[in-house]
Amino acid sequence: MQAWIQQGLHGMQMGGRVGNYDQTFVVYGPVFLPNATQSKISEINYGGKILLPSSALNLLMQYNIPMPMLFKLTNMAVQRVTHCGVLEFSAPEGQAILPLWMMQQLGLDDGDTIRIESATLPKATFAKLKPMSLEFLNITNPKAVLEVELRKYACLTKNDRIPTSYAGQTLEFLVVDLKPANSVCIIECDVNLDFDPPEGYVEQPRQVTPAVTAKPPAPDASAFIGAGQKAGGSGGTGQNATSVFGGAGRRLDGKKKPSSSVSLSDGTGVSTSNAAPVANDLPAIPPVVVNEDYKPGRVSFLRYDYKRVDVLEKELREKEASKAGQPSNVFRGGNRTLRGAR
């Protein structure tokens, strides 16, 4: 075979006739190839190249067919067309050995007639393939796998279903789109490869939790006021409320203390005589509500409409003072002087 190719190349240098190769052959599958081994049959079936007789090589060299040799295959009965390369010139005379998938694509059976013509195809720049089974999703790096498997093909034709072998199983791909033409050569070219979702794949709908825009209401202010009084006033004595001055009053002139009651303030500006006693059980702060419907992918930072404790205490004092109608004083009653009137 190498001698034939050398003779053909020599004929091209000397100047052979230029034309299109066009022949008719009887087509058979790889199992009909004489002395075919199982590895040889798999090599043919999982590729895009055919076997032609040795006489075809002589004609191809005489016609000065450029390399790589590409062919257009036509089933004249149903007018189906595809394209391929050539693997060897070892087929029986008058016969062409085609991969099984190519015979199915053209609607051919063993013993049918096929027309084979030489073809010139542009280099591929883009190819989109659609996996025909969900097993494709188990491939870790599909582009790397196809980069190796597509080396067994010389060209691609739109709407062809090409098989590849991966991990002992057959994966089929439908050629969905090609650029710059519907039939392209994929030998020694850079192809941008893309994939459609596999056949039978159903994408699960995504559940999106709406974002929280309004601020939730803050707990009652009395919870914080009571907590502050308990924390600041207990001091380890066990008392819930404190007095500014404790004990009985004494006069410097020895007289007894007047019977009028003196109301004291508890330090907050509110009279203890009118203030309600603080309960032992303070109102609890409302528990934090956990968003059990939270889905990963969105983090919500909630800002409660809180106010500082000193601001709340000031507002509470002003509110109590407005209810009493007059500002509160620590000491009430008439004033006294230690000196006699002049």
Curated annotation (Swiss-Prot):
Single GO MF descriptor: polyubiquitin modification-dependent protein binding
Keywords for this protein: Cytoplasm, Nucleus, Ubl conjugation pathway
Region annotation (Disordered) ranges: 245-276, 318-342
Intracellular or extracellular location(s): Cytoplasm; Nucleus
Disrupted-gene phenotype: RNAi-mediated knockdown causes embryonic lethality. In embryos, DNA replication is partially impaired causing a delay in S phase progression in P0, AB and P1 cells; simultaneous RNAi-mediated knockdown of DNA replication checkpoint kinases chk-1 or atl-1 suppresses the delay in S phase. Prevents DNA replication licensing factor cdt-1 down-regulation and causes cdt-1 accumulation on mitotic chromosomes.
InterPro entries hit by this protein: Ufd1-like, Ufd1-like_Nn, UFD1_N1, UFD1_N2
Primary site of residence: cytoplasm
Polar residues composition bias: residue spans: 259-275
A Gene Ontology term for the protein's cellular component: VCP-NPL4-UFD1 AAA ATPase complex
Gene Ontology BP annotations: embryo development ending in birth or egg hatching; ERAD pathway; positive regulation of protein localization to nucleus; ubiquitin-dependent protein catabolic process
Cytoplasm is among the record's keywords: yes
Membership in a protein family: Belongs to the UFD1 family.
Function statement: Functions at a post-ubiquitination step in the ubiquitin fusion degradation (UFD) pathway. In association with npl-4.1 and/or npl-4.2 and ATPase cdc-48.1 and/or cdc-48.2, involved in the cytoplasmic elimination of misfolded proteins exported from the ER. This pathway, known as ERAD, prevents the activation of the unfolded protein response (UPR) caused by the accumulation of misfolded proteins in the ER.
Quaternary context: Forms a complex composed of ubxn-3, ufd-1, npl-4.1 and cdc-48.1; within the complex interacts with cdc-48.1. Interacts with cdc-48.2. Interacts with npl-4.1 and/or npl-4.2.
UniProt protein name: Ubiquitin fusion degradation protein 1 homolog
Species of the source: Caenorhabditis elegans
